[in-house]
Design a protein with these regions (language model features):
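Short, surface-exposed beta-strand-loop junctions and turns on beta-sheet-rich folds
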Residues: 57-59, 78, 142-143
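Hydrophobic alpha-helical segments typical of transmembrane helices
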Residues: 9-13, 59, 101
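Charged, gly/pro-rich active-site loop segments
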Residues: 2-8, 81-144
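Short, solvent-exposed aromatic-acidic interface loops
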Residues: 54-58, 109
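Short beta-strand segments
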Residues: 21-55, 69-73, 82-85
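Short, basic/aromatic recognition patches
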Residues: 2-24
Length: 144
């Protein structure tokens, strides 16, 4: 079953998947026009899908040039259930709040704080505003 919405509010399944211990495949556009996709930790904050990266990383530089982003969050317990969010990064947050946020995500995924020696540049929270969300659940029976 597939369900699509163009609403800027998070679909309940998107929020559920982003709040859980599920990984996101995140796609941004390189300056050459090619796509770059990587796996990231994901969360929900202020009604938005949020990611956390560092300012020296290619992904962040891509988003500075072009804020469009696709975030696909797969249910770790059921790979045939996922949410795709196409949207834009509409807010970024740096400083102590971003540093604490990466610790929150790290505790969610690993059980401990993010290692300080792994940080090479300033942390930044990326808030994604959806323009289109597609929810896929291939196990859901749509016949009544």
């Amino acid at each position: 079953m597939a369900e699509t919405t163009n609403a800027p509010e998070l679909h309940p399944v998107t929020e559920e998947l982003a709040s859980g211990k599920n990984f996101a495949s995140v796609t941004t556009m390189l300056p050459s026009g090619q796509f770059q996709t990587g796996v990231m930790w994901v969360g929900v904050r202020n009604g938005s899908v949020v990611l956390n990266t560092e300012t020296h990383r290619r992904r962040y530089k891509n988003l500075e040039s072009d804020p469009r982003i696709t975030v696909m969050i797969r249910d770790e317990n059921d790979p045939y259930r996922y949410a795709e969010v196409r949207g834009e990064v509409t807010r970024t947050t740096t400083g102590p709040e971003a540093r604490e946020h990466i610790d929150e995500l790290s505790r969610k995924y690993t059980g401990s704080d993010y290692p300080p020696d792994a940080i090479k540049s300033e942390r930044v929270i990326l808030e994604v505003t959806p323009r289109r969300q597609t929810i896929i659940d291939q196990n859901k029976d749509t016949s009544d």
